């Protein structure tokens, strides 16, 4: 005991070096490389689950103990020491650590993020790149554990880390629409077919002598769907939507078939005439007759029924034709006369009221 007290360095010069460990007592060679000693102790401190544990012997190095100062100023750290077999094995184990162990927890410590050491101890991995075990302090970031703090993770890893709602779902819209389109191709006509049918329908309708309003009324009589003259006009002009054109095409096609099949027999013609109002023949008035009517209009813009009858007999025209001509002439005069000016029919005072039906023509 006295000898040990008188020679405090006898422990360092002994043939064996003994230090405390969590698993028990381990002996080390006095000529063992301090770098290898630190790496072997670190490897023993890593359990099977991949979580490195803080070794109390390594922690004591950062407390400024005698071993810390001795190793920091040792000439072995200043000279170039080639890595041994244990160094290569340690680097290979750290480099080939499985990704699921590294991503096990966001608080898992990376070998590059261990506590600082006073000496720059480093090892070389299997790829030949230096791997600092103790000299890079810091904390790990989730998703960047295997790639350091500056290099982003691969694209596959970033995709897996996204929330399921944020991930792009597989595009099934095109497949669904393509399936529906293939299913409806047999029933839905193309735009070229609709254009060709509209052209043929207009030609056949004019040849048969029916107006667009007649067709709309006929569809209501045949199928219960009354269409206006505007709808038939927009169909012929291809101004309806594609969906409405497809709905109206079979109805008009049936009407054409019915009209073509009933052209020869009088009974069928009467049936079609009853379905819709047949177009009346346009009346053409000669220039001489029109001059007589103009002269009479300047004298009396609103003739009575007896005057219309006598005028129709003298001109050999129908009474309805004369009445409609006067009605249309008054409307024309009203359009041509600026507002506020006195119109010709206001000069003459007549007690006969104009028939309201003349304005419909």
Swiss-Prot record:
UniProt GO MF annotations: DNA-binding transcription factor activity; DNA-binding transcription factor activity, RNA polymerase II-specific; double-stranded DNA binding; minor groove of adenine-thymine-rich DNA binding; RNA polymerase II cis-regulatory region sequence-specific DNA binding; RNA polymerase II transcription regulatory region sequence-specific DNA binding; sequence-specific DNA binding; sequence-specific double-stranded DNA binding
PROSITE patterns reported in the protein's UniProt record: HOMEOBOX_1 (PS00027), HOMEOBOX_2 (PS50071), POU_1 (PS00035), POU_2 (PS00465), POU_3 (PS51179)
* Compartments in which it is found: Nucleus
Q: Which residues fall in a compositionally biased region of kind Basic and acidic residues?
A: 165-183, 343-361
Which tissues and organs express this gene's product? Brain specific.
Q: Where is this region: Disordered?
A: 99-131, 144-192, 334-361
Q: Which residues cross the membrane?
A: none
The alphabetical list of record keywords is: DNA-binding, Homeobox, Nucleus, Phosphoprotein, Transcription, Transcription regulation
Protein name (record): POU domain, class 3, transcription factor 4
| Organism expressing this protein natively | Rattus norvegicus
Give the gene symbol.
Answer: Pou3f4
């Amino acid at each position: 005991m006295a000898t040990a007290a008188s020679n405090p360095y006898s422990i360092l010069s002994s043939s064996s070096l003994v230090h405390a460990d969590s698993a028990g007592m381990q002996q080390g060679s006095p000529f063992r490389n301090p770098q290898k000693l630190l790496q072997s102790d670190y490897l023993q401190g890593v359990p099977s689950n991949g979580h490195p544990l803080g070794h109390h012997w390594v922690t004591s190095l950062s407390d400024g103990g005698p071993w810390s100062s001795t190793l920091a100023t040792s000439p072995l750290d200043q000279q170039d020491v080639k890595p041994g077999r244990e160094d290569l094995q340690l680097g290979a184990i750290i480099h080939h650590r499985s990704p699921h162990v590294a991503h096990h927890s966001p608080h898992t410590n990376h070998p590059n993020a261990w506590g600082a050491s006073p000496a720059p101890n480093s090892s070389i991995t299997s790829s030949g790149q230096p791997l600092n075990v103790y000299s890079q302090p810091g904390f790990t970031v989730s998703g960047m554990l295997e790639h350091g703090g500056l290099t982003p993770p691969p694209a596959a890893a970033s995709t897996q880390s996204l929330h399921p709602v944020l991930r792009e779902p597989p595009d099934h819209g095109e497949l669904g629409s393509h399936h529906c389109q293939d299913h409806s191709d047999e029933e839905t006509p193309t735009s070229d077919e609709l254009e060709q049918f509209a052209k043929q329908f207009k030609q056949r309708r004019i040849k048969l002598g029916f107006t667009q309003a007649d067709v709309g009324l006929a569809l209501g009589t045949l199928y219960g769907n009354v269409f206006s003259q505007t709808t038939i006009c927009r169909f012929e002009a291809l101004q309806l939507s594609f969906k409405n054109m497809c709905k109206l095409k079979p109805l008009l096609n049936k009407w054409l078939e019915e009209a073509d099949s009933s052209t020869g027999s009088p009974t069928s013609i009467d049936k079609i005439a009853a379905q819709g109002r047949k177009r009346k023949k346009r009346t053409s008035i000669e220039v001489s007759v029109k001059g007589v009517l103009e002269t009479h209009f300047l004298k009396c813009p609103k003739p009575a029924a007896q005057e219309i009858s006598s005028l129709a007999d003298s001109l050999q025209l129908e009474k309805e034709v004369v009445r409609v001509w006067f009605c249309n002439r008054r409307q024309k005069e009203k359009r041509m006369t600026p507002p506020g000016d006195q119109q010709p029919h206001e000069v003459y005072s007549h007690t006969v009221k104009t028939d309201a039906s003349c304005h419909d023509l």
